[in-house]
Amino acid sequence: MPSFTSKTLLAALAGAAAVNAHGHVKNVVVNGASFQGYDINSFPYTQNPPKVAAWTASNTDNGFVGPESFASSDIICHKNSANAQGRIVVAAGDSVFVQWDTWPESHHGPVIDYLASCGNTGCDKIEKTALEFFKIAEAGLVNGAQAPGRWASDVLIDNNNSWMIKIPANIRPGQYVLRHEIIALHSGGDLNGAQNYPQCFNIEVTGSGTVLPQGVKGTSLYTPTDAGIRFNIYRSLDSYPIPGPALPAGFAPVAQGSSAIVSSATAITGAATNAPAPIATTTAVNVVPSPTTIVTSVVQTSAAQTSAVQTAVPVQTSTRPISTRPQPTRCPGLGRRHLRKVARA
């Protein structure tokens, strides 16, 4: 008969396999050119991995950053993150299409996008705790009539696990860290139950814009008790307070669609360049399926630090819990940590 220890180990391994379903950004597409992301399955074990625009991180289990770590540097660009040594040139006004390898349907929540200027230091050298992030887009609750609701994360799944981010046309040229994040709220009703999945990339914005909004240090973006962090999704909802600093006036999410990949490209390195944004070649290597475009709208509240995202579809105005509400989904990663504690006992 297997020992308790061996049973515990098998359960832990099963939990680890389930955690790997969370996902990470595998590549970024700009004007049809696909740039490789940080490959958590090979780069950490490669002596000289390629220089990419995606920041490195130690989330080899596709894990998350919990609210208990919001004051630590892990929340900035994920656990033990380090500067990317490459960057992608993007013209102001262009879109960046990020493709996740997968995302679990049960992990409902908002999708938020930030920029942080690297100034004259360069994003490959800047200290991450010095970065000050401002929002360029946010999307949250799409329809809350029936728990757990339809969320931006569901739109991402329907869009082939991908998300379109528009770089503001009036943004000042320079090097920036693009911070793309999904916040999973399936356990958000519990203190420290939310799960943040930040993904960072170095970009160089070209153009003649002059706008550079005031930013917030990454370690000050959220607190564990923010209304949009400790949030129960298992009830009918008519709104959701997206966490983080307010979205600057004039910035908004774009219609979600697809982006054809017609070439592969390599991130550039070294000093800043005045080169134009990458233009795709005519040699097709892959095409992303084109799902139905889904649009969300933003309801801004300039006096508040949060704003709600809804569609024009009417939703229930009652926020009371429904009588037969679904039960929160327990993340396998939490069970795995519990099993480790039991094995050590």
Curated annotation (Swiss-Prot):
Residues 335-345 have a biased composition (Basic residues). Its main location: secreted. O2 binds at residues 186, 195. CDD domains: LPMO_AA9. Keywords: Carbohydrate metabolism, Cellulose degradation, Copper, Disulfide bond, Glycoprotein, Metal-binding, Monooxygenase, Oxidoreductase, Polysaccharide degradation, Secreted, Signal. Disulfide bonds join 77-200. It catalyses: [(1->4)-beta-D-glucosyl]n+m + reduced acceptor + O2 = 4-dehydro-beta-D-glucosyl-[(1->4)-beta-D-glucosyl]n-1 + [(1->4)-beta-D-glucosyl]m + acceptor + H2O. Lignocellulose is the most abundant polymeric composite on Earth and is a recalcitrant but promising renewable substrate for industrial biotechnology applications. Together with cellobiose dehydrogenases (CDHs) an enzymatic system capable of oxidative cellulose cleavage is formed, which increases the efficiency of cellulases and put LPMOs at focus of biofuel research. Belongs to the polysaccharide monooxygenase AA9 family. This is AA9 family lytic polysaccharide monooxygenase D. It comes from Podospora anserina (strain S / ATCC MYA-4624 / DSM 980 / FGSC 10383) (Pleurage anserina). The lineage of its organism: Eukaryota, Fungi, Dikarya, Ascomycota, Pezizomycotina.
